[in-house]
Structure formats: structure tokens, C-alpha cells
Amino acid sequence: MDIKNKIIVVTGAGAGIGRALAICFAKQGAKRVICSDIDAIKSKEIADLIDGVSIEADVSKEADLINLIAQSEAEIGSIDLFCSNAGILHQAGLDALDQDWQRAWETNVMSHIWVARHLVPRMIARGGGYLLQTASAAGLLNQIGSAPYGVSKHAAIGFAEWLAFTYGDQGIKLSVLCPQAVQTDMIAGMDGHAASLDGILSPHVVAQACLQGLKDERFLILPHPEVLTYLRNKASDYDRWIGGMRKLNRANDTSNTPKGK
């Protein structure tokens, strides 16, 4: 995909990867970047910086996403690329409350579903469009220390796969961004060793990898290339992979498994 002269929406644009993506898209000549965030002040700040448009939205609410799509297309024009980037990480295992699971599910999974539900038919009607969904390497592998995050990111990738093969013949293109650790507020509470096994990338580096992935129209965008090796190892010997993850879990002392007396 050529970013030049495209109308692009980025959720979670107030900080981290979303902010970096918005800046990169503007520098690449996007016609207009709509910066959306749950924090209206942050989304306006980045929009003002890049001469974009700010629209407040909480991606865990379908009504907000309906409004984001409708307002963007009514005021700016047809959306060429929608980046479903906003996500949350809650460090918990069996102790996670139902509301923790629900919030992770709505933000990390349903947000992608709601965007597709209300935008894909519009895109098909005009000949096609592009969706970029930020998932995580945790959706391909898993997440030590956070059951809601690992599970929800697996579901997000599963939905992205379904979209890609169901609507690919109707002009819908799709990429899934799956980084490991990125220097954002999201990893502030993570164990340092767990976060830095393959290096903590800056949001700018991730955004650059994303631009290349969009240019190549790759389904999986992996800023940490090691993830592909890990995924192949997992597929080739699941039991060995589980053993390796248990070893990492012990090393990081983040096990959520209840211990017997």
C-alpha cells in the first residue's frame, strides 16, 4: 500500500505505537490522518502536531467506533486505511476478575470486530480498503504473567485471519502488527527480564517496520523477527515449546499457578 494521499484513521493515537504511526503516516504524505484516543487532550495534541484531525473514542464501546467511522467519512472522506491500534495489558492470571477479562475482550478483540462490522461493507461498496490491526507476539506465542492479554490477542489474530480469507477476494487487505516489547506505558509494570529478552523497541522503530509491512502488504508484520522462529518452533514441537515457556515462567517468577501446600 502506498500511504501517499490516503485518508487514515489511527486509534490509540495519543501515545506509543499509535502516536508514532500517526507521525509516520503524515510524513509519508497521507492526505489526512484522523487521530483517535480515549484521551481527547492527547489525541488533539498529536493531531495538531501533524495537521490531522482529532476524534475522541473509547474503542471498548461500539457506539464510539460507529461515530468515529461515520464522522471521519462525513467530514474528511472515505477511509482508505483503518489502524485498530488501541489495546490494554492487565497483569493477572487466575486472580483476574471478570471485569478484567471483559475489558480485555472488548478492547483487544471486540474493537476489531466492531470496526470491521461497520467499515468493511463501506469499503467493499467502493472497491476495497485496508485494515491494520495491532495485536502482539503474545497472540502468536503467549504472555507470561497475563492470561487476559495472551488469550485476547490470540482471539484478535484468529479474527484477522478470518477477515483476510473471507473478504480478500472483495478488495479487503489486512495486516496484523505483532511486536514483542515496545517502550510504551503498557510495559511499565512488566518484569524487566521478561520484557527485554529480544530487546525493547521504540515506537518509532515499530512504526517504520509497519510502514514497510504495509508497503509489502504482508499479513504478519513482525518488528522482532525472532518471533517467526519461535512460532515455527512452537508449531514443530508443542510439548517442547510448553517446556521452554515453563522455564521462562520460573525465571521471571511470574507464575499465576496456585501452589499446593
Across the structure, where does each feature detected by a protein language model lie?
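Conserved glycine-rich cofactor-binding loop
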Residues: 14-15
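Conserved glycine-rich Rossmann-like NAD(P)H-binding loop of the short-chain dehydrogenase/reductase
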Residues: 30-45
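The beta1-alpha1 cofactor-binding region of Rossmann-like NAD(H)/NADP(H)-dependent oxidoreductases
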Residues: 40, 57-67
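Conserved mid-core segment of classical short-chain dehydrogenase/reductases
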Residues: 66, 88-102, 145-148
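Active-site helix of classical SDR
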Residues: 116, 152
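Residue(s) in the substrate-gating loop at a strand-loop-helix junction
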Residues: 136
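C-terminal helical subdomain
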Residues: 176, 192-230
